[in-house]
Every structure is written in structure tokens, then in C-alpha cells.
Amino acid sequence: EVVMAPKELAAYFGTPEKPECHMLYNVSTMVNLWGALASRDTRLLKAQLDALHALPDNCWFVNYLRCHDDIGWGLDEAVENRLGIDPQKHKEYLYHFYEGNFPGSWAKGELYNYDPATGDARSCGTTASLCGVEHALEKGDKTALDYAVKRDLLLHTAMAFLQGFPMLNCGDEIAQL
């Protein structure tokens, strides 16, 4: 598992003549998929996918939506700045949104490792909970549940069509809360 910008990942794969790592977890795409879903803005995701597609052919990834780890909001701050997005405010929006502590949020995740001095935090939760299934079930809202399932399916469909190998994890196959 390597958590860094796509341009820095190629070295871990080696070369076709001297291969090293065969596959890496696709942490940055996971983070950018969740970011795009909450912000309803795909520009960061597109920039990150463009960077991945520019890597050599020997670079393969395991694509996933959730795993046993928290979501560290390690977005590409240079790209955010170029797009006119304040990196710190965006990160704070994302972790509050997925905590369910933002107006209009459907998510029911948990804040993890919050540091008031830096404003940094991470998010925890299953795919189903972050997509709104848990929140909709608690409210008995069938329309919200329908949207939550559609968000879950959207993310899984996107993941399945990314270059690399899709991985279901943490009860995704049964929408575990």
C-alpha cells in the first residue's frame, strides 16, 4: 500500500525489464471517488485518473471503495489550487459531510483522528453507510434509500470499469452497515 500522487507511483512498479511491485492499492482513486460524490464535482477525479492513465503499462492497481483503513483525505492540493478549490476547506467539508455533520449529508460515518490544531481528520464507515443506506433506514425513508442504493451502485460501477482489478471489501457485497 503506497499513499502518494500517481506520478510518484511508477517507481514502485519497476520497469518491464526489472519488475518490482505487480499491483498497488489504488488509494487515490478511492479518495477521489468519495470526494466527487460528496462535492458533486468530478474535476479532481478526472485529473487523478488522467495521471493514472499516463503511467507505464506495467502499473496495475487494485481498485476499491472501502477497506479496513480510514479514509485519509489526501487529495492533490496542487490540482485543487489550480481548480480554485481551497484544499483545507475542501478536506474539512468532506470529513464533516461523511460524518453526517453537514447540511444535506446523507452519510453516517465517523470522524477519526481529528486534530483541532491542524484541522485534519479522517473518515470511517462502510460503503453502504457513507452512501446513505444507514441514514435512510433509520428514518424509514424509501426515497432516500433508493438514492443511497443508486449512489452505492454508481461507485461500484465506476470502480469496476477502472483499469486494474476491482475488489469488494468490508461487506460491500451485502451493503453491510
Give the role of each language-model region.
Residues 1-177:
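Active-site and adjacent substrate-binding regions of carbohydrate-active enzymes
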